[in-house]
């Protein structure tokens, strides 16, 4: 089973697009896109991880 991950090295960003490509975080919350998810990862000091692509 391959671990799913997202490269968040270019984040945080001050603004995210409204593009809808959902990701499910380890907090069981659905993030609208990679930018929203990566900003949350940065804010969590790396404790938030990707559970899977798509809605939770």
From Swiss-Prot:
GO terms for cellular component: extracellular region. It comes from the Eukaryota. PROSITE patterns: KAZAL_1, KAZAL_2. Glycans are attached at residue 45. Residues 6-56 form the Kazal-like domain. Keywords: Disulfide bond, Glycoprotein, Protease inhibitor, Repeat, Secreted, Serine protease inhibitor. Its main location: secreted. GO terms for molecular function: serine-type endopeptidase inhibitor activity. It holds the Pfam family Kazal_1. The record marks 18-19 as: Reactive bond 3. It is found in: Secreted. Disulfide bonds join 8-38, 16-35, 24-56. Avian ovomucoid consists of three homologous, tandem Kazal family inhibitory domains. This is Ovomucoid. It comes from Meleagris ocellata. The lineage of its organism: Eukaryota, Metazoa, Chordata, Craniata, Vertebrata.
